[in-house]
C-alpha cells in the first residue's frame, strides 16, 4: 500500500478530501460518472473527510471501490478523489475518480495504476480474511446499496452475499455482473452507532452471470470488506492460528494400540521369524563378550541382552530394574515368573530368545578324555534331573547350582514316553531309587557331581533325588522334595490334583506348547488308557473314570491340558449338572459354561478365569483337530480326535459310564 500511495502521489492523483472541505465532485455527474470503471449513481452525500471520524462509528472508516473490467466505451476522467483514513490492512485505499473526454494520458496512467493494484492484491491473495461472527446487533457498518436500474434488492432487505465464507464470516459487498447493472457503496450517515464495532450488513445483487467470472473478485472483496483485526473476538483470532493438518485424527499413543491375538499358526510363523532375527545376537555377544551360556551371565550381561532385544524389536514398556539379576537367577525363574517381568507379548519374545540360547548351550558335546558314549551336559534352568533315561550325566562342580526346591513336577521337566511309563512296575515293594553301576572314571577327575538314576513309581512321581558326592563311591544323598507330596497325588486325582499350581491357563495371552500340543501324542502308548487305569490299584474309586492327571501321565503330555480336564468332568457324575454328553458320539454340552470355567480356573490357580478365556482355549484346538464347535448349537462341542483308540472304549460305553458310580464304571470297563 505504501508503494502504491507513493506512485499515486508522484502522478499527482492523490488528493485529500479534507482539503476541499466541500462535497465530492461526483454530485455534478449522473449517468456519465464512473467509479473505478463501475457504472454507478452518485451517493446522496459527501464521503467523510480525512480529518473527521465517520458518523455512527468509534473506528475510523475507509471506503474501497474495486476495479472491474467493463466492456464498452468509458469516458475519460476529469478528477480523482482519494479518501484514506487509517489503513489497518492491505488494499485499504479508497479511490474515487470521474471521467470526461479531456485527458487520455491520465486515463492511461490510471489504468497502469489499476494493474499495479491488481498485481499487489494477487500477492495478498493467499491471506485469509479474518472471520467474524455474524452478530448483526453489535456491528454497525455497511448498510445500504443503491442500484441504478432499481431492479435489484437493496438496503436491509438484501440477502447475504454468496461470496466468501458461508458461516460466521464477514460478508462481501455486491458485485456488478453486467454492463446494464450499476451499483455503488457508500456510508449510511443517517444511522447512529449502538456498538463499538462497525456493522457488516451488505446488500447483494445476484446477476445472471456467474459470481466467479472475475478471478480477482473474491480476493478484492475480502480485502475490501473485512473489518480491522481489532474487531475480531479473541476466540476467532485464536482459531485462525490453528491450521488443520489431518494429524489430529491419528492417535499418538502407540502403546495403546490393539495388538492382534496370537493364533497357533501366527505363533509358529512368529517363532520362525524370531529365530532368524535372534541370529543377530551372536555379533552382539562377540562385541560385548557375553558368554553363550545364559547361566554364566552377570547382571551386566543380562542388562546388555535386554537392551539389545529392546532395540532390535522396538519393545516398549520394559522395566530394566526388574532384570537386575545374573543369568543363573534369570534362567531359574521359569516361564510364569519370567513373563511377569515384562508387559504382554514383550516377555514372550524375551523368553523365546532365552530358551533358544539355553537349548543351543545344552546340546551334548564330547568332553576331553571322556568316552563319547557318556556325553557331558551343562546345567540349565531345569537342572536336567534325569530319571531312568540312558546313562548318568556329569557336570563340573564349578557349574553346579543346587536348587533349594524343585518348582516343576517330574513330567513338566521331562515328558516321558508312554512306552517307558507303562513299562515301569508299580509294586509297592519296588525300590524307589535304583543306583546303577558307577561309570568307569579312570581318566576323569575325582571331584565331580553325579545325577543318579531312579525308576519312577506312583509313590515317588513328584519326588526327585540328587546324589552328591565323589565318583566311585562315598555317595551321599540329599533329598529335594517338591511342594506336593506323593500322598496328595495318589489321594486326589480330581480338581485338587498335585498339578494344580503348575498348569497354565489357555487364555489368549499365553499359548504354550505344554498347554497346547500340536495334536494328540504322536506316539501310541502301549495298551489303552482303560488298561492303564485298571492296573492302578491306588486309584480312588469315588473319583471320575478318567482323571485328568492320570490321562496326562498316560499320554506323557506333561501338565494337564484343557481337553483332558473336560474328559475328567464328563466322567464325573457330580459334574453332570453343568457338563454332559449329548448322546451323539463324542459330542458334549456345557450346560453351565461359567461353572466349567470357574473349575478350570481353580485347577489352574487362575481366579479370573471366565468362559470368554475358556472359549479361546477351546478355539485353539480347532486347528489341531482335537475339538470342534458344533454348528447351530450353543455351548456344544465335539471331540474329533480318535479318542476310541486312545481310551479303549466307544462313545456309548463312555456315555453310559456317566450315569454310573465311578466304581461301577471302572468295573464295567
Curated annotation (Swiss-Prot):
InterPro entries: Ets1_N_flank, Ets_dom, ETS_fam, Pointed_dom, SAM/pointed_sf, SAM_PNT-ETS-1, Tscrpt_reg_Wos2-domain, WH-like_DNA-bd_sf. Residues 556-640 bind DNA. GO terms for molecular function: DNA-binding transcription factor activity, RNA polymerase II-specific; sequence-specific DNA binding. Residues 276-361 form the PNT domain. Residues 1-10 have a biased composition (Basic and acidic residues). Coiled coil: none annotated. Its main location: host cell. It holds the Pfam family LMSTEN. Residues 90-142 are annotated as: Transcriptional activation domain. Gene3D superfamilies: Transcription Factor, Ets-1 (1.10.150.50), Winged helix-like DNA-binding domain superfamily/Winged helix DNA-binding domain (1.10.10.10). The keyword Ribosomal protein does not apply. The keyword DNA-binding applies. Residues 1-27, 132-153 are annotated as: Disordered. It is found in: Host nucleus. GO terms for cellular component: host cell nucleus. DNA-binding protein that specifically recognizes the sequence 5'-YAAC[GT]G-3'. The Myb-Ets protein induces predominantly erythroblastosis in chicken and transforms avian erythroblasts and immature myelomonocytic cells in culture. It appears that the Ets domain is responsible for the effects on erythroid cells and that the Myb domain encodes the myeloid-transforming capacity. This is p135Gag-Myb-Ets-transforming protein. The lineage of its organism: Viruses, Riboviria, Pararnavirae, Artverviricota, Revtraviricetes. The gene is GAG.
